[in-house]
């Protein structure tokens, strides 16, 4: 190999890196696409003739390589934190005041503001200017190694520009799919008859988590940096915004809407400006991220419950759109509740295409005065089920029809009833009703109930449709041979379900009570019942007066419990479950004189836990003597906060409630 070949290869790499930054980062290309393609072809030809010269930072590595069998795990040297949320100006004001109070009342003026991109957070690690590792955020402590996939994203430099970067530099940012690329990707999928993506965020996440990086390379992904993690070998600027400029000078893209402002009032102006421009921006956003600009102040403020005290996400209000209500269907739930569902002309709102929305109940239909054929306003906020919020009556067509609530169950034909004082109309068919049967069985095997692994919704639906099961006890009478008649059910999968059912027979009394699906008996109520009565027999025999003596049980819930156990059909199901081998350890009372660490404390769990399931955490807290509730109030003693803790955490901070982490909970348990 001649020296000239090696030299030409380096020239091509430098040139391609330079022009990639001009195109993808600065949006200011110097050469036509055809010239860039010519340079890339020349590079590929040289590397094909001299494979020993191929390096990880070569532009040729963006095409993707051999598929992986699985992603390896990466432990973040500096945890990747989530953000607290603000939903209005008063919550933003509270954030500002808390920060100033914590640093002794000093004035905080400058903030760095940027759109909150709706994508996937990633960490990029550069060593000596070369991209050596990329990882997802995961649970904030551990993520997945997606280096091969990230190398295919043109907006991310494989080699940093310049030479004044730190020897080790970790850049955090968001991988996203621009709106235009998302539309093209879905259009191509439609032409091929393939499944389309629901929204750009799902498309970006799905593309980034492909085991075959060649698929990722074919997807229109982009990237904007938003912060740094590990920094070794050089000092960065003392301003968050100026750090952005440093990162950009090394070839990493930053969102062009990022701005430094000089007052809290300017922050609010920026928020309104971005909110108004939201639909015009080429990418999906769901709010604005606001960070105190002074790095020294950031360091003084520190972190709380896996979120920084110096930053907050100011979320946009729920998105609304107008569409046509074409029809109304009535769905039957586990407890017989009949819910009217609006069938809509599909409309893109809140980041997804919506074709169904809840109308809640007959009272809501009356309140809205909505009719079939009306133009309606629907709202979708985050993961909340879309709902009809108003009717544009001046647009009502002459053909509009009244919505008639059924007098018979739309599934089984049983009589429906509405108890005085309740908003819900219910089917009286019980387990005779196929819809109720399906939902009851799904609830019985769910994670918080008997937790039967592998027995998903589609399997339950087939079992009921084929009349193979009627009650929960029938599940334990199934054999692997019988299960193999179901669609997509091989012998191994069938045996796994049988094994999982056998394993689930050992449970706890609270889980068993919860699995029965008694109206308004959730996890906490089931735990309180078990702790108070100690046995199933005592609960079955309890009067309403005795039940009301249990913590958090009132007249209505007590009536539901006694009614459930008085019904002969329910008695038979419970007895059959016990005959099939469902059992649990004896519920023991705390030892006399034993002091539980959380005795008498009211606690709330919020956010995502990395090492404990939510049910497991609740049970652990209750075993420590705590009363676990679902909302924060002045009566709350402790808030245990995991990742992505939002409004509950903010409210707890405002009320001065003690805040603990998942690690604190683990230490209490151990």
Swiss-Prot record:
Limits of the BRCT domain: 593-670
Presence of the UniProt keyword Cytoplasm in the record: no
EC number: 6.5.1.2
PROSITE patterns registered for this protein in UniProt: BRCT (PS50172), DNA_LIGASE_N1 (PS01055), DNA_LIGASE_N2 (PS01056)
GO annotation, cellular component aspect: cytosol
A Gene Ontology molecular function term of the record: metal ion binding
Residues that hold NAD(+) according to the record: 33-37, 82-83, 114, 137, 174, 291, 315
Catalytic residue positions: 116
GO biological process: DNA repair; DNA replication
Group of enzyme by EC: ligase
Cofactor(s) needed: Mg(2+); Mn(2+)
Catalytic activity reported: NAD(+) + (deoxyribonucleotide)n-3'-hydroxyl + 5'-phospho-(deoxyribonucleotide)m = (deoxyribonucleotide)n+m + AMP + beta-nicotinamide D-nucleotide
PANTHER family on file: CHROMOSOME TRANSMISSION FIDELITY FACTOR 18, DNA LIGASE
UniProt record similarity statement: Belongs to the NAD-dependent DNA ligase family. LigA subfamily.
Name of the protein described by the UniProt record: DNA ligase
Gene giving rise to this polypeptide: ligA
